């Protein structure tokens, strides 16, 4: 005999909600810092540390905080006199502590530097730097990775220096120094930059090959007279030629294939229903 059909259950079957999948395209180019030699790393750190110490550049912070004094108890005349004496002593000691004002000691030298990721980023956007240094201890690495494209687009030499924050932060009186930039108007670090720039490795960004320059070439700046003579020597035919020609020995930019990347959340995660559905089920 055939089995009798079963009556459908009273409770409604709960449908599983499909997991949201985020689809995006990956980045085919790998952006990375140039490899700095160990000897060059020690030379850069030692040179900057010695120069900063000789200039006396340091940030002084007033760490003395006013401690809350307990309420005065009126017990006898002796205690009140003691409290008055201690108050007068504190007033006398305050001017001694405030004699050394908080802030940067040589303000003019501080204006020649860009300290911190935000300052270095803004200075690179305005094309105000001669050299940009980033600390390798910055985590996550994406915090300083944008400095690679920025520095190459502006033609500014940049490199990642290990132990930059560990060596320079105590000298500057800061907790950490994740990025350091030297502005174009610097006069206090002129000789140091001439010695450091040849040791900076060259950065490689695939879509910014025209902006790449050798740091050593930046040291030998041409005079305005020589530039004017070259412009006068160029004929009208040379100026009328199309400018979009690859230089000799320059490799053309090759388009890389893109891959579709899907981000799927964890399916094993226990997701609680919203409060509105909880109250409806009850």
UniProtKB/Swiss-Prot annotation:
The modification N-acetylalanine is found at residue 2. GO terms for molecular function: ribonuclease P activity; ribonuclease P RNA binding. Keywords: Acetylation, Nucleus, Phosphoprotein, rRNA processing, tRNA processing. Signal peptide: none annotated. The gene is RPP38. It holds the Pfam family Ribosomal_L7Ae. InterPro entries: Ribosomal_eL30-like_sf, Ribosomal_eL8/eL30/eS12/Gad45, Rpp38. This is Ribonuclease P protein subunit p38. Residues 1-21, 61-103, 262-282 are annotated as: Disordered. GO terms for biological process: rRNA processing; tRNA 5'-leader removal. It is found in: Nucleus, Nucleolus. Its main location: nucleus. The keyword DNA-binding does not apply. Gene3D superfamilies: 3.30.1330.30. It comes from Bos taurus. GO terms for cellular component: fibrillar center; multimeric ribonuclease P complex; nucleolar ribonuclease P complex; nucleolus; ribonuclease MRP complex.
């Amino acid at each position: 005999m055939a089995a009798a059909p079963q009556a459908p259950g009273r409770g409604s079957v709960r449908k599983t909600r499909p997991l949201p999948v985020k689809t995006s395209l990956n980045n085919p180019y790998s952006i990375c810092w140039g490899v700095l030699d160990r000897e060059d790393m020690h030379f850069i750190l030692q040179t900057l540390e010695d120069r900063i110490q000789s200039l006396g550049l340091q940030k002084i912070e007033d760490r003395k905080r006013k401690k809350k004094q307990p309420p005065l108890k009126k017990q006898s005349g002796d205690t009140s006199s003691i409290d008055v004496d201690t108050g007068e002593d504190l007033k006398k000691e305050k001017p001694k502590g405030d004699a050394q004002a908080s802030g940067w000691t040589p303000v003019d030298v501080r204006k020649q530097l860009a300290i911190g990721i935000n300052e270095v980023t803004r200075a690179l956007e305005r094309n105000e730097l001669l050299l940009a240094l980033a600390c390798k201890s910055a985590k996550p690495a994406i915090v300083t990775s944008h400095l690679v494209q920025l520095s190459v687009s502006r033609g500014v030499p940049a490199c990642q220096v290990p132990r930059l924050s560990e060596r320079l932060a105590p000298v500057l009186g800061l907790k950490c120094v994740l990025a350091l930039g030297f502005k174009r108007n610097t006069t206090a670090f002129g000789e140091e930059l001439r010695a450091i720039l040849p040791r900076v490795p060259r950065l490689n960004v695939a879509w910014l090959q025209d902006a790449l320059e050798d740091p050593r070439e930046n040291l030998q700046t041409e005079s305005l007279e020589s530039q004017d003579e070259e412009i006068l020597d160029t004929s009208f035919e040379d100026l009328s030629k199309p400018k979009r020609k690859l230089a000799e020995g320059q490799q053309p930019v090759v388009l890389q294939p893109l891959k579709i990347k899907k981000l799927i959340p964890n399916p094993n995660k226990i997701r609680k229903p919203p409060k509105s559905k909880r109250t409806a089920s009850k």
